């Protein structure tokens, strides 16, 4: 029986993580979780899983939950998030929160020697050098939950990582993959939220449409697998059947395939190095697919992917700036305050405005995050 702490239980990854726990009640126990403002959902999860600690975002929601939570301790805010991450009984901490708020809980959980199921891209994007350094220092495993990184992780099982020639990350292309840049001037929030292949939260669905999601994944892969950016490629693959590939020095290519279902990589992270049945996911029959398609990525068409490569290669504090600018811009687009292509413009402005710090401390990263957010808000 593995004890799980889940950060971000009401989001897309969080709800699918709970599906996995539900499927294997003899294997996993939920000891703590956090939610944002979805208190009705939190009540249902408490009643079903009886965790010891639950954290909510706002203090005013604590009393509401305490009235129905029985013996479950209710905490709130950033301190509450840390309490969930550091629950003494938790063996695995699944970080499924959205945005850079996931950074501090991850670092503290690593210091407490918890195994990390990492679904929060922004943690590695903003502070990859600090996170990987801490993981090495405390001998902690970072197990990828993203389908692409899980695919690479599985392809590398038993392989000599020094023999890697390149990583090939697949991209569905998002909601607007078939639109021209001229057509993108007129797209709506509702259009952007209709992803062709995956069921995801609103922020990541917009990131998928701008291709920033894939850019964040490139930076994440660089840190997780220690591969230079020059050896990480992205290929457009509309069917989302091949989740990523690894090419070795002898030009052999290993690929991980499966029907698009986030519960598969989530469960693999929780059961690693073992596997368990996942009976209600769709079996992949290639003869039903017929044909798989691949296209070279155009970084002028998908400018956010180019920004991510530039930020990653520049290094230091630049990825944190790009990430903060993107979070503010995407939120403004979701609120219908800016157009879709303005997201790219705001990120570019923030990156051009920033003076890079080569090796920022945690305090400097948090300060850069805050100042970048203020700068972008002033531009809107």
Swiss-Prot record:
Residues holding NADPH: 10-13, 36-38, 120, 122, 201
InterPro entries: DXP_reductoisomerase (IPR003821), DXP_reductoisomerase_C (IPR013644), DXP_reductoisomerase_N (IPR013512), DXPR_C (IPR026877), DXPR_C_sf (IPR036169), NAD(P)-bd_dom_sf (IPR036291)
Keyword Oxidoreductase found: yes
Signal peptide: none
Disulfide bonds: none
Keyword Glycoprotein applies: no
Keywords: Isoprene biosynthesis, Manganese, Metal-binding, NADP, Oxidoreductase
Name of the protein this chain belongs to: 1-deoxy-D-xylulose 5-phosphate reductoisomerase
Organism: Bacillus cereus (strain ATCC 10987 / NRS 248)
Gene name per UniProt: dxr
């Amino acid at each position: 029986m593995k004890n799980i702490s889940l950060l971000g239980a009401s989001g897309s990854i969080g709800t699918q993580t709970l599906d996995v726990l539900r499927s294997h009640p003899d294997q996993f126990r939920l000891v703590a979780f956090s939610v944002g403002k979805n208190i009705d959902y939190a009540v249902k999860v408490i009643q079903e899983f009886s965790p010891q600690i639950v954290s909510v975002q706002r203090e005013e929601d604590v009393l509401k939950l305490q009235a129905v939570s029985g013996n479950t301790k209710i905490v709130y805010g950033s301190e509450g998030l840390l309490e969930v991450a550091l629950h003494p009984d938790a063996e695995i901490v699944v970080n499924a929160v959205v945005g850079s708020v996931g950074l501090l809980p991850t670092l503290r959980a690593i210091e407490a020697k918890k195994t990390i199921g990492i679904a929060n891209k922004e943690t590695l994007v903003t502070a990859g050098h600090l996170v990987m350094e801490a993981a090495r220092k405390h001998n902690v495993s970072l197990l990828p939950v993203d389908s692409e990184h899980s695919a690479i992780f599985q392809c590398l099982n038993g392989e000599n990582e020094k023999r890697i020639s390149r990583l090939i990350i697949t991209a569905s292309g998002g909601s607007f993959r078939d639109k021209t840049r001229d057509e993108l001037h007129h797209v709506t929030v509702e259009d952007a939220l209709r992803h062709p292949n995956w069921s995801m939260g609103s922020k990541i669905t917009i990131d998928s449409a701008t291709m920033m999601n894939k850019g964040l994944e490139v930076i994440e892969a660089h840190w997780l697998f220690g591969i230079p950016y020059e050896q990480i490629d992205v290929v457009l693959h509309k069917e989302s059947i091949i989740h990523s590939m690894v090419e070795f020095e002898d030009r052999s290519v290993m690929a991980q395939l499966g029907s698009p279902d986030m519960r598969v990589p989530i469960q693999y992270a929780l059961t690693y190095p073992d596997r368990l049945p996942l009976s209600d996911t769709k079996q992949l029959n290639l003869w039903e697919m017929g044909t798989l398609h691949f296209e070279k990525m155009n970084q002028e068409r998908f400018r956010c992917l180019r920004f991510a490569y530039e930020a990653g290669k520049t290094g230091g504090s630049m990825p944190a700036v790009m990430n903060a600018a993107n979070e503010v811009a995407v939120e403004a687009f979701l609120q219908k305050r800016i157009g879709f292509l303005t997201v790219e413009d705001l990120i570019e402005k923030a990156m051009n405005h920033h003076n890079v710090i080569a090796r920022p401390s945690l305090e400097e990263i948090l300060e850069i995050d805050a100042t970048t957010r203020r700068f972008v808000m002033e531009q809107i």
